[in-house]
């Protein structure tokens, strides 16, 4: 009689893994059965699908646009290990998608783990009623009245940078090359520190900041091949995001550093509030967070949620605005005539004073056009992915032909299907923005009838701030900071590339927390420009 082998731990583990993979396969087949079969590009890799190809491209938006032209406004893209994603490039479908955010379409497991690992379980991480509660509690800090009060903070930070640059230019007025990206990082960090938390990180004064040092380390290191593979496979196995790759170790360090700072600032503010020193405004960001800790059940936030909100604000304040300011200086250095035109508008009204919030918002049309053209061409986040939480029927403004040859004006989306919006593609689409959609041309925003035929919803027909319940809460804050800083820079300095005759170098994508521009051949995410004073 053959002896019976005792079942060991590894047997149980392999059996559980087999069952898990089987359930995933059955679920995937079920989703495919409930989702309209769409056409799409051929697979390039059984292992990575087209994910690695898109991830390594300097312009995935152009790739998505070419696929939309070939396969229609919604198409299927092969992903990791035989999975697929549905990409939508149709204005009506995108409006429907965003309207159902946080309930009908939710963040993918990979996205939620990524957000939790970086900032914690706050507004970015939450869904449904929890998201609605947290957003409602924070909204007063981003009202027009609140941002109007903060405008002077943005100008103060800009002038601190000007003082530092003037010192640099004193030593070499005609040949000063400055890494502008580093300084845009510092102005953004100091602005969010003072505006949000009444705390000066002091990075513009050369003061060491732990959080700035960790952020800078993302800009100076490249992810390892192993880290890239882990990131790609995490779309199917999100638990891989807990592996100690060089990138994930940096993320852990960033979260701890931001958490320590946030904890310290909260504790200081609580003591000020208890002492009734008057230093804490209830409608400031940190004041509202303190208030939310002890609020009634409807708006109450846990301590973990409060810390997560502060982490989000530090991260968003540092990353997004600094990237946009850097792109603005790149585009204006490429086109000195547009730089001069912007300077003329600013100096014709403001030589010894600064614009008010109202003037920044409505009184400087060319500045507004430059800012929105930068945000159109260079959104900090290029694609947005969500997972269907329920079966859905998505309407289309343009009919498409399915894989079976049927013409349809709506598509079925099965529960569990990952759906993506290619933001960069939509912002640069020739169908929506005209034949010169890929060009930096701020004048388009000033033309009569501009945008009348653009069906895309969202701020000024842009998807940069997304739309619906998850539209960027800090949109007004970011726009005002962007305009204030750029107005000071352009009024006081001229910018050009430092090569012979101002030759424009190739601008590459550097993988940081968010993709950043970098000049080809530079170490890390550096953008050196020749800076001269305006005489």
UniProtKB/Swiss-Prot annotation:
Listed EC numbers: 1.-.-.-
Q: Name the GO cellular-component terms.
A: membrane
Q: Which cofactor does it need?
A: heme
- Report the superkingdom from the record: Eukaryota
Q: Where are the transmembrane segments?
A: 7-27, 225-245
For whether the record's keyword set contains Ubl conjugation, the answer is no
One matching Pfam family is p450
Task: Write down the InterPro entries for this protein, in alphabetical order.
Answer: Cyt_P450, Cyt_P450_E_grp-I, Cyt_P450_sf, Cytochrome_P450_monoxygenase
| Single annotated GO MF | iron ion binding
Protein residues bound to heme: 472
Membrane topology, as annotated, equals: Multi-pass membrane protein
Question: What are the protein's UniProt keywords?
Answer: Heme, Iron, Membrane, Metal-binding, Monooxygenase, Oxidoreductase, Transmembrane, Transmembrane helix
Localization in the cell: Membrane
The pathway to which it is assigned is: Secondary metabolite biosynthesis; terpenoid biosynthesis
Q: What does this protein do?
A: Cytochrome P450 monooxygenase; part of the gene cluster that mediates the biosynthesis of clavilactone A, a meroterpenoid that features a unique benzo-fused ten-membered carbocyclic ring unit with an alpha,beta-epoxy-gamma-lactone moiety, forming an intriguing 10/5/3 tricyclic nested skeleton. Cytochrome P450 monooxygenases claO, claP, claQ, claU, and claW are close orthologs, suggesting that a redundant function or pseudogenes are present in the cla cluster. These monoxygenases are not involved in clavilactone A biosynthesis nor its modification.
Family from the record: Belongs to the cytochrome P450 family.
Q: What is this protein called?
A: Cytochrome P450 monooxygenase claQ
Q: Which organism is it from?
A: Ampulloclitocybe clavipes
């Amino acid at each position: 009689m053959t002896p019976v082998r005792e079942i060991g731990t590894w047997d149980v583990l392999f059996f559980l893994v087999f069952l898990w993979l089987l359930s995933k396969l059955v679920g995937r087949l079920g989703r495919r059965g409930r989702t309209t079969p769409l056409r799409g590009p051929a697979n390039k890799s059984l292992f990575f699908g087209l994910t690695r190809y898109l991830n390594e491209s300097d312009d995935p938006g152009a790739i998505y646009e070419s696929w939309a032209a070939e396969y229609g406004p919604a198409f299927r893209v092969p992903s990791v290990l035989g999975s697929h994603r549905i990409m939508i490039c149709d204005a009506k479908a995108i409006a429907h998608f965003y309207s159902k955010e946080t309930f009908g379409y939710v963040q993918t497991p990979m996205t939620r783990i990524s957000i939790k690992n970086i900032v914690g379980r706050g507004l970015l991480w939450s869904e449904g009623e929890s998201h609605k509660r947290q957003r409602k509690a924070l909204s007063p800090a981003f009202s027009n009245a609140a941002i109007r009060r903060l405008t002077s903070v943005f100008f103060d930070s800009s002038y601190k940078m000007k003082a530092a640059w003037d010192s640099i230019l004193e030593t070499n007025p005609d040949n000063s090359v400055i890494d502008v990206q580093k300084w845009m990082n510092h102005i953004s960090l100091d602005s969010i520190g003072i505006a949000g938390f009444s705390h000066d990180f002091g990075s513009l004064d050369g003061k060491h900041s732990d959080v700035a040092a960790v952020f800078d380390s993302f800009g100076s290191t490249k992810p390892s091949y192993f880290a890239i593979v882990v990131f790609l496979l995490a779309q199917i196995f999100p638990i891989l995001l807990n592996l100690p790759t060089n990138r994930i170790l940096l993320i852990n360090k960033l979260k701890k550093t931001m958490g320590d700072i946030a904890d310290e600032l909260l504790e200081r503010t609580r003591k000020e509030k208890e002492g009734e020193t008057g230093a804490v405004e209830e409608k400031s960001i940190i004041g509202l967070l303190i208030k939310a800790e002890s609020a009634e059940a409807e708006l109450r936030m846990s301590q973990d949620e409060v810390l997560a909100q502060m982490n989000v604000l530090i991260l968003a304040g540092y990353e997004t605005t600094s990237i946009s300011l850097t792109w603005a200086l790149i585009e204006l250095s490429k086109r000195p005539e547009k730089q001069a035109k912007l300077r003329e508008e600013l100096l014709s009204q403001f030589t010894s004073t600064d614009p008010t919030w109202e003037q920044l918002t409505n009184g400087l049309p060319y500045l507004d056009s430059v800012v929105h053209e930068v945000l159109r061409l260079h959104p900090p986040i290029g694609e947005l992915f969500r997972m269907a939480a329920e079966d859905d029927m998505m309407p289309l403004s343009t009919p498409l032909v399915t894989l079976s040859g049927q013409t349809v004006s709506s598509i079925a989306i099965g529960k569990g299907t990952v759906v993506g919006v290619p933001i960069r593609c939509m912002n640069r689409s020739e169908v929506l923005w005209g034949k010169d959609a890929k060009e930096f041309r701020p004048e388009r925003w000033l033309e009569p009838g501009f945008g009348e035929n653009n069906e895309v919803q969202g701020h000024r027909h842009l998807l940069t701030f997304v739309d619906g319940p998850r539209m960027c809460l800090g949109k007004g804050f970011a726009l005002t900071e962007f305009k204030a800083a750029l107005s000071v820079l352009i009024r006081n300095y001229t910018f050009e590339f430092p090569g012979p005759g101002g030759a424009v170098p190739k601008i590459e994508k550097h993988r940081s927390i968010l993709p950043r521009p970098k000049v080809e051949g530079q170490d890390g995410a550096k953008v050196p420009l020749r800076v001269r004073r305006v005489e």
